[in-house]
Amino acid sequence: MLLVLPAEVRAQLTAEQKAKLPPAVDHEVSFAKEIYPLLEQSCTKCHGKGKSKGGFSLETREKLLAGGDTGKSVVVGDSAGSYLVELVSGVDPDNVMPQKGSKFTPEQVGLVRAWIDQGLKGEEGVNFAKAPVLNLKPNRPKLPGPEGGHPIDRLLKPYFAKHNVDTGKVVSDRIFARRVYLDTIGLLPPVEELEAFVADTDAEKRRKLVRRLLAERKSYAEHWLAFWNDILRNDYAGTGYIDGGRKQITGWLYGSLFNNKPYDKFVYELVNPTEHSQGFTKGIVWRGVVNASQKPQMQAAQHISQIFMGVNLKCASCHDSFINDWSLADAYALASVYADKPLEMVECDKPTGKISDVRFIHPELGKIDPKADKATRIRQLAEAVTSPNNGRLSRTIVNRLWARFLGRGLVEPVDEMENESWNTDLLDLLASDLADNGHDLKFTMEQIMTSRAYQLPAVNGSEQAEKEFVFRGPLVRRMSAEQFVDAIATLTGNWKNSPAKKIKFDGANLEKKKDTDVPEANWIWSNADAAKNANPGSAYFRKSFELPGKPKTADVIVSADNTFVLLVNHRNGMAGNNWKELKFRNLADRFKAGRNVVTVMATNSGEDASPAGLWLGIRFQFEDGSTKDVISDKTWKVNTEDIKGWNKPEYDDSKWATASELGGLDVAPWRLAKELKVNGSDLAFGGKFRESLQNKTALTTALGRPNREQVTTQRPSVATTLQALALTNGEVLARIIKDGAAALANGEEKQERLAKRLFHLALGRGPTEAEAGMLDGLAGGENAKESVEDILWAVAMLPEFQLIY
């Protein structure tokens, strides 16, 4: 409701009108209990908390007595002669306030009259002034004694004592390991690694496990990619990508996570973007006519405020907010930083005729020159957001991490950082430690996950239903959509063969390490001049080699000008018909210990001579962690005649010529090094393409993966009917499990042993006697594929599998 004192000259009430006023109540009114709630609800949107429409403010007694543009509004001791009473009483139907919303009742008017007649008394500390901004300035709290011990636990010890929270027990090594694996890299712990961890007697083993997992840069980046994609609205397909109204930042984001870019630099490059991070502030250029609050520059203002400052400007982008103190002018001032010309403020689709100024929402953190060019303004904004004086930046991200790991933020909602924390000192500690340690997010993650607070037994959300929240331990959490799909792939070994088709990894700038490098293969053909010209037709290639054992992964990447068909040991492998699109796939199931033969028929299409070539690299990874590369080079055998049986392993190619090397991947005319980065082919050489690199499906949508046209900082944790249907009757999961069962059933492992291994891998523990009996029953079917499928369904539907305890 709004109370706006009119600007026109007012007339005094007549004696007859005064007689119609509701009488003042006959008791001494309480300002805090009766007057404050009434005026807070009806008047402060326009006349309090920094706002003074019509020049009138009731923030303090002095301002109330001063009146507004039309003169005094209150006469102490004379409520009938007070203009404020005239307005709220409604005795003059042409001059009544509030203009919008519910009018004052006679009893409420009587309260206001009595308050004025009784001297306009207030209470110390109770007023309508704008509250001090919380969580903005940096602050390092003093840790309570005794010295030593984990800083988080030292701060929480008195909190737990005050709230009678029992912290005597922490979770077992098995539960801790499963929790940490899923939280750090999003994957289930391998059985061998888990058992080694449980058997380890080192007192520091939990800290060492956290640190080791955070150091797995590729797995870490792939896991956290989904988290940041949600927040930054980055995706691989959807509105705006086709017509250029939106741009991916996948490569920049992946590289930032892989290289653990300091968070302040990460934010700086998003606010003041590089070539590869500009998609964030570019936003989405919506088709057709859109509300002014959805223009790209306003999107940038909304998202910078929400994501990095925990401030909701969405309402204020259209009108002065009714849910917080932010105004239309605040939103436009920030949006103007990204505008090409001065912005006229538009209120609820109606132009106001007022030109916005240019400033950050907290100008005290850094000034922005409104006369400067756009690039300078954006740089000044980035400097303000990442200023050492901006404690809100670090508080907002550590609060998000705490919520991610423990199920609920120190401040809730996590996008409303102007709210009070349930433990201000803990929030300040995490934020100041992040800033003092180079804005290293992995430092904060380790700090949280090595605390006793993180290691407490999980608590069901229903147990946290107190009127006032009390932290008793981490909440039980559901696996994310990506974690669930990756967990099924971990059980079956049946990973995706490629990432999303339109994914782009330009700008990743990955440091060259073995887990992201690719084999240094050469383009080859039957003649040395093929890079310039080769006759139309096919060339037939063979490569024989030995493997020390059956590989765990065999990542193959191929391009051929123009087409190719590849076989492994005379079994179908892969094919391609466009040399510009590198093809890659994990073909581990085609290879064996001992001698293997790869054959490729590559065809130079067309009627005229043109460049021709084959480029191929294979990286094998074995159970002991060792690797072996096989590349296209001059050791390959080549022939230009299609001889019967040429692609069979036993064929004798001793009389064939050796291939001619044409140059490395980036040799002209192909120059595919950039394409390798853009489409993410280099990431294939880690064994798997995870769900975070895929487009969403009906399954992942049901499990909570959002439409990334809007910022999503937290996914729903409550199970839905749609999720239940997708998990029990959905085509996508049924196909994943069916394909996975087929892959497992083709192996040599006995069904009973396979069932127990899958159970152990899925839950992090061996089956009980009753569970073992159930698994034996499922494994006893005559059809191996169907039996394995039943086992996978049984395990995947267990709450213990789907939840993080």
Locate the predicted segments by residue.
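An acidic-aromatic loop/edge-strand motif
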Residues: 509-531, 597-682
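Axial heme c-ligation environment in periplasmic c-type cytochrome domains
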Residues: 26, 45, 51-56, 70, ...
